[in-house]
Amino acid sequence: THNHADKHDTHVGVAIKLIEAIRLLPADARPKKLYGCEVWRDLDWMTDEDKIPFDCSGHENLQAALLGVFDSQVAGGKRYDLATMGRRKAHATYFASHGTDETTGLNFGMDLTPLIEDPSLDINAFAQAIIGRFADEIKGRLAKLT
């Protein structure tokens, strides 16, 4: 699904409503995992430990065909189809900066599973904790180097 730190209100709304609906299910009927993905803003701002990488290497022809279905997002000079495929390739290269590429395409997800396992978790606080870990990583690096 979408994630609750998405750039678009409609996408955030979808993620929240889905989480709320899953929370209404009996625990044994809930999915074992729930991931929120992002295309527009991307999730490369998250710490590597928080990112869930999804290997998108296979079937590039099928991926391109599926992206091409959304004519309204491809027509008129905005080539979201090419940008999406390019971003996946870039993630595959940049994710492991000191190793050789293991994939030719990666997309990142946010693990939303804790939000469906524990309905008492606050959705906003969950997002802020992820942002906080990223901020702490940057603070630590700057403290070490300055």
State what each model feature region is:
Residues 1-27, 143-146:
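Active-site beta-strand->loop->alpha-helix modules in alpha/beta enzyme cores, enriched
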Residues 25-146:
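C-terminal accessory domains and tails appended to enzymatic cores
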